[in-house]
Amino acid sequence: MGNIWVAFTVSLAVTLIAGPLVIPVLRRLKFGQSIRSDGPSRHLQKAGTPTMGGIIFLAGTAAGGFLLIRSADGLIVLLMALGYGFIGFLDDYIKVVLKRSLGLRAREKLLGQVLLAAALAYWAVFEAGRGTGIVLPFSGFLTPGGIQMDLGWWPFLAFTVLLVVFMSNAVNLTDGLDGLAAGVSMLVALALVPVALAADRAGVAAGMAALAGGCLGFLFFNFHPAKVFMGDTGSLALGGGLCAAAVVTKSELLFLIIGGIYVLEALSVIIQVISFQTTGRRVFRMSPLHHHFELGGWSENRVVITFWALTLVFAAAGLAGLYRLV
């Protein structure tokens, strides 16, 4: 248990040290964020804010994780975060440095995400002995130990790939306001610590603590008005690490509850696109969901803090779903 909070503290400290060192370099290299012209007008003043700042908390997370985690399951969570972060880094680099506004082509990004998710599924089943079952949240209220559905290898592979790709991109969509993705992800990661401990995966718990510490440190530079944005480098890394923890601990469905904000953000985009293409009407003022509230007159900080509070509610609901599952 001690290593868990040491990982959190080391990650927090390294992130706080790295921020003032990295941000001026990003600014000097002119790694500035471009802002959508069709977005909220007050966002236009953010143009030029350094992006790719995810490398700041990834440095902290890696320091806290690799120094203290010795188990393969904890290391695989860190490697998934770094792997997805590398995809995001390539995307950011192409957009910011090579000036190709769309970054990586969609099929290129998707291919990388699918391959990493498939590798995670293979490792979890054939190397970590996870099996191919998924646990139903709240089923512990019905029977001690809960109810587990064994999918078999191929359905489990498809389920894992869909989950990881969907949720990692949902985290990416959540990164649209100062402090939103970092704050939500910190709370989700902290909620996954007891989930991992309940699954007897102390290494994963330490990995989640390190990720949470990195997010907290990053908030010192990313809360409104942000001095730096995490970019796809950071948001995809968060998604990859959180999803890996959920898969290894058999808590995929719990993760959909705990990460409810991510799900709502992604669904708002899907609903908006389907509605506009089929009826010509928009359900939301703008998607993802956080922009809907912004255009409704909410301040940026009000939206962010409200979404943090909702994450606490989702986390409490998810943790309640652990009852008698172990």
Curated annotation (Swiss-Prot):
Q: Coiled-coil ranges per the record?
A: none
Q: Give this protein's Gene Ontology molecular function annotations.
A: metal ion binding; phospho-N-acetylmuramoyl-pentapeptide-transferase activity; UDP-N-acetylmuramoyl-L-alanyl-D-glutamyl-meso-2,6-diaminopimelyl-D-alanyl-D-alanine:undecaprenyl-phosphate transferase activity
Q: Name one GO cellular component term.
A: plasma membrane
Cross-referenced CDD domains, in alphabetical order? GT_MraY
What cofactor does this protein call for? Mg(2+)
Q: Does the keyword Transmembrane helix apply?
A: yes
Name the PROSITE patterns on file.
MRAY_1 (PS01347), MRAY_2 (PS01348)
Q: What class of enzyme is it?
A: transferase
What name is this protein filed under? Phospho-N-acetylmuramoyl-pentapeptide-transferase
Q: What is the species of this protein? A: Pelotomaculum thermopropionicum (strain DSM 13744 / JCM 10971 / SI)
Q: Upper taxonomic classification of the species?
A: Bacteria, Bacillati, Bacillota, Clostridia, Eubacteriales
